[in-house]
């Protein structure tokens, strides 16, 4: 299958040929494309209009019933699910965007076809393309059959609600909950840009709630404070396979934590779409080579199955690509990927979008997700929240610091500095807290300022933490 590229009037040729040869097309890239000959060249441009008539062997009268405009021949492409990406200047005076690609986008979406548009503000017909063509290259690469054979994602439930809200209401709030792979500049930032390409008229708010080293147990307790308190979330990404594994959480805790995040999120807003991600790190590589799945992935997948949450298994995909010699672990970038590695994470998520948004139109209904009456584990942390630090009774030595920062020369992690903190510096310092609940934890700072806590609940013998 081929990728068709059409610039300017080349867009006319590319779209028309593709509509008659859908079985031969992988994807289409069109740049400032002519999609309606009545817009360009148009009858006002007599010389070019006559060239058009000559080329098509038509008369001016014949044009009153002309059927060769791409804007009128999109249905075969949409039925075949041919992905289209377009780059256009919004100030194009030669081939006006509003009369051409904007019409294609609107009609293609209405037919359920996948389309992305990169709009260049203030740009006329020239210059074509992008100074950095990476978004187009990524789009083309991820739609090649050879690329797709490595993909491992599970389609469950629906992502219809987020699509309809983004396209119809033209407002969207997207949240990213996870550890340092989510916190860093990488897949998250690419998805933010690519969502804007898919929905160029939508105003997005992105809630970036990645904190290094945190898995689902702290995630389920900080969900309310770090994500849900920001407003109604339309699309939520959750990931924690690496940190739930490297921090030695038990299988039981892995389920309770992930279910805590997912169930709490859905109970807060049943219309919220959720996507679960599984990232790779060193210990998982050998498991893939042995055709094994990490237990933490299987445990998180139990939650995904119970709540019909789609998931993307990057452990399997990246492991297989490395086995086949496509790249090395060093080239990928390791646990915290290089930009090269993050392109694979983002591409897999985009494939899930393509699959689950296929056939959905802006007029599709928004439907609440069904939430199972019973949780997988009655002790899951789906009512998790932060307790106000001021509720603690500070006895000997403890103090409340409104904006705490470690007094040392070392690098400070976001989320562990310039935040409210209870601080004690001497052995024997004490505090007490009254609470009612099935579980409680203490969110501690890491690093050289960390200490050892001894705790007792309901008069039980003290234990070290």
Which residues does each PLM region occupy?
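Mobile cap/lid helix-loop segments that gate and shape the active-site cleft of serine hydrolases
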Residues: 33-34, 38-76
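Short, proline-enriched alpha-helix->beta-strand connector loops that line the catalytic pocket
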Residues: 77-84, 113
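Conserved catalytic region of serine esterases and O-acyltransferases that act on ester linkages
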Residues: 145-158, 169-170, 343-465
């Amino acid at each position: 299958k081929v990728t068709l590229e059409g610039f300017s009037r080349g867009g006319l040729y590319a779209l028309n040929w593709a509509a008659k040869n859908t079985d031969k097309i992988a994807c289409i890239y069109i740049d400032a494309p002519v999609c309606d000959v009545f817009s360009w060249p148009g009858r006002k441009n007599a010389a070019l209009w006559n060239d058009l008539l000559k080329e098509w062997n038509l008369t001016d009268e014949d044009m009153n019933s002309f059927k060769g405009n791409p804007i009128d021949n999109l249905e075969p492409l949409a039925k075949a699910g041919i992905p289209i990406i377009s780059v256009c200047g919004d100030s194009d005076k030669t081939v006006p965007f509003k009369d051409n690609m904007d019409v294609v986008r609107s009609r293609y979406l209405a037919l359920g076809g996948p389309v992305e548009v990169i709009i260049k503000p203030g740009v006329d017909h020239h210059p074509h393309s992008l100074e950095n063509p990476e978004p187009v290259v990524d789009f083309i690469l991820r739609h090649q059959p050879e690329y797709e054979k490595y993909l491992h994602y599970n389609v469950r439930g629906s992502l219809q609600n987020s699509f309809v809200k983004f396209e119809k209401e033209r407002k969207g709030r997207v949240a990213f909950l996870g550890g340092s792979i989510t916190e860093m500049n990488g897949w998250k930032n690419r998805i933010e840009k690519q969502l804007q390409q898919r929905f160029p008229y939508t105003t997005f708010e992105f809630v970036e709630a990645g904190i290094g080293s945190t898995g689902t147990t702290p995630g389920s307790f900080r969900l309310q404070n770090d994500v849900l308190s920001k407003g109604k979330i339309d699309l939520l990404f959750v990931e924690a396979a690496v940190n739930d594994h490297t921090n030695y959480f038990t299988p039981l805790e892995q389920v309770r934590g992930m279910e805590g995040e997912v169930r709490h999120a859905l109970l807060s807003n049943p219309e919220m779409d959720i996507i679960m991600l599984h990232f790779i790190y060193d210990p998982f590589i050998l498991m893939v080579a042995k055709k094994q799945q990490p237990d933490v992935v299987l445990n998180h997948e139990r939650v995904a199955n119970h709540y019909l949450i789609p998931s993307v298994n990057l452990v399997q995909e990246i492991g297989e690509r490395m086995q086949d010699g496509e790249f090395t672990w060093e080239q990928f970038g390791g646990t915290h990927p290089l930009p090269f590695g993050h392109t694979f994470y983002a591409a897999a998520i985009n494939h899930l979008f393509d699959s689950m948004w296929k056939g959905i139109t802006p007029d599709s209904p928004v439907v609440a997700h069904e939430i199972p009456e019973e949780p997988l584990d009655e002790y899951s942390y789906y009512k998790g929240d932060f307790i106000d630090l001021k509720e603690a009774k500070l006895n000997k030595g403890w103090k409340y610091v409104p904006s705490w920062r470690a007094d040392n020369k070392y690098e400070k992690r976001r989320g562990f500095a310039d935040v409210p903190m209870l601080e004690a510096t001497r052995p024997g310092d004490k505090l007490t807290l009254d609470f009612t609940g099935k579980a409680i934890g203490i969110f501690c700072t890491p690093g050289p300022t960390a200490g050892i806590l001894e705790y007792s609940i309901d008069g039980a013998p003290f234990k070290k933490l």
